[in-house]
């Protein structure tokens, strides 16, 4: 699958996770509704599904990975930033096939597209601190 299709999968995952985080609906329902309503012809749908289910299933674990590196309480984190960080931390901790720098750079780009004005700097700061602990020898 092309890198652009994976990038689109991540973009879609941010949107779907944002919806899930706010609605607290079942993740399978969020996935179904998202795929039914969005144009996903240029999306790696299998990767989108993996990100969505992986982040939802491991959200407590992923939140635990980010907490020590947050400059504020987890509850004060914006929903977009939380979704972006969860995706990156999922890729870093559960997807060894995704290079270290790719996971971080993709998260920064997602934060630029979907986040508040300086959220990409915040995301970069958190991942810069967390990533070496998650993948100590796999930069």
UniProtKB/Swiss-Prot annotation:
It comes from the Bacteria. This is Transcription antitermination protein NusB. InterPro entries: NusB-like_sf, NusB_fam, NusB_RsmB_TIM44. Belongs to the NusB family. GO terms for biological process: DNA-templated transcription termination; transcription antitermination. Transmembrane segments: none annotated. Keywords: RNA-binding, Transcription, Transcription antitermination, Transcription regulation. Pfam families: NusB. One of its GO terms (molecular function) is RNA binding. GO terms for cellular component: cytosol. The keyword rRNA processing does not apply. CDD domains: Terminator_NusB. The keyword Glycoprotein does not apply. Involved in transcription antitermination. Required for transcription of ribosomal RNA (rRNA) genes. Binds specifically to the boxA antiterminator sequence of the ribosomal RNA (rrn) operons. Gene3D superfamilies: NusB-like.
